[in-house]
């Protein structure tokens, strides 16, 4: 069984997404927005596991295991007003000095540095309420100031403080074209921390989110209220097997171990279809889908929540959750068909991992009782396109030296030389990641990795003296 998971919501994006996520989780577990159980009898035996995401007291009052953080109060205030008495007020952090990140990663990072003890103290106290703490999930954007900067500072601190706990992120990347020029700076700086400190990163981008929202919702005026429902749907589906456990995939570690073949290749692309009234409001009516149809449709680029060039991608690992009226024979038939369509490198297990998820028994009955929905997480080569887009925009702006003065803030950037060095080093880290993904497409990938490891061991051995001690250089 999985342990407890603490959700960290950083910045406006993270807290907006969190608002929809907790609404969804509460609905699936028959919990009201005030935290009270909606089951008719408190003695009713539950068919779910609330413990990974909720604390429960003796009066059947549920409280999310969540920490809300922002540099300004408006979004968190909106969340608290919507869910009165639901969140623990001790788990809310807003910058007390009125500082704003102002779309600058450096400002957000500096705010995190100056307030790190206070934030970590809240996290430590929340961990104290757990019995079998498994890890964190961070909700944030990499493009703004707080989500990227404060989020980066938090990733570094948690990786150092809790090195054996799983650190997952749900990270929203900007569209290729953006009104805020410095978003490319923020993205590269945050991406470095995702590469170095996250164990698994589920990637979204605004272009794909807006495109899918236009097809899913009846409302022609698409905004963040719609895209955030899509993100919360993915998080709900990823954690379905943890909250409605079976004998497989009942923990974060069991899910991500199927997807991540090596530590650096931990960026995952989500897909989902169809978005039904179980997850979103004001959805467009659609015909019923069989398990077979859903599994094949998940491979369609139009159902991916991250924009990537899908021409003949190489898949390293695939994990599906199929929820609803699932027919095992159709799952087997679909897997046979998909094995013929998906290109795996020879070093990969070439296995498609499928979780038969459980639809919450507390949700209203669907108009179509045979409805099936599916979520797919893919570790595949084309995610590198997201990083290439970020790098291309970054390179153009950085070459001109534009807006660098905005980042000469705090202890990390004490001089303009510090700014230049940090930007250059972060760009190199991202470049190395892209090269790793390209190399992983080759059948010789694992052989090359082993050779590199042996060479590194050889270099270390050469630095030892006759007694086996490290030489002083």
UniProtKB/Swiss-Prot annotation:
Keyword entries, A-Z: Cytoplasm, Cytoskeleton, GTP-binding, Microtubule, Nucleotide-binding
Family, as annotated = Belongs to the tubulin family.
Q: Which residues bind GTP?
A: 143-149
Please share what else the UniProt entry notes about this protein: Present with 7200 molecules/cell in log phase SD medium.
Instruction: Report the superkingdom from the record.
Output: Eukaryota
Q: Which GO terms describe its cellular component?
A: cytoplasm; gamma-tubulin ring complex; gamma-tubulin small complex; inner plaque of spindle pole body; microtubule; nucleus; outer plaque of spindle pole body; spindle
Q: What is this protein called?
A: Tubulin gamma chain
A molecular-function term among this protein's GO annotations: GTP binding
Q: Bias regions of kind Basic and acidic residues — which residues?
A: 43-56
The gene from which this protein is expressed is: TUB4
* Renumbered residue ranges of the record's region Disordered: 33-56
* UniProt subunit comment: Interacts with SPC72, SPC97 and SPC98.
- Cellular compartments annotated: Cytoplasm, Cytoskeleton, Microtubule organizing center, Spindle pole body
Known role: Tubulin is the major constituent of microtubules. The gamma chain is found at microtubule organizing centers (MTOC) such as the spindle poles or the centrosome, suggesting that it is involved in the minus-end nucleation of microtubule assembly. TUB4 is an important spindle pole body component that organizes both cytoplasmic and nuclear microtubule arrays.
One Pfam match, by short name? Tubulin_C
